[in-house]
Amino acid sequence: MFQPDKQILLEIVKNQMPFGKYKGTLLCDLPVSYLEWFLRKGGFPEGKLGIQLSTVYEIKSNGLDEILWTLKKMK
């Protein structure tokens, strides 16, 4: 079962997309279609951003958006 890192969860509700069409958008607010685009183009970027984006994708694609909403309220 997918178990995201607690620190990563906190980061995805605070950090913004640093480039591209959704530059400045909170990572947790990125649409699934944009995350799927990364996958079609060969995958998420390397490093921490890639881990954050893949975490957002896993949460959203499995219908667990409530996790993100709860964390956003807490920040």
Region annotations inferred by a language model:
Residues 1-75:
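DEDD superfamily 3′-5′ metal-dependent exonuclease/proofreading module
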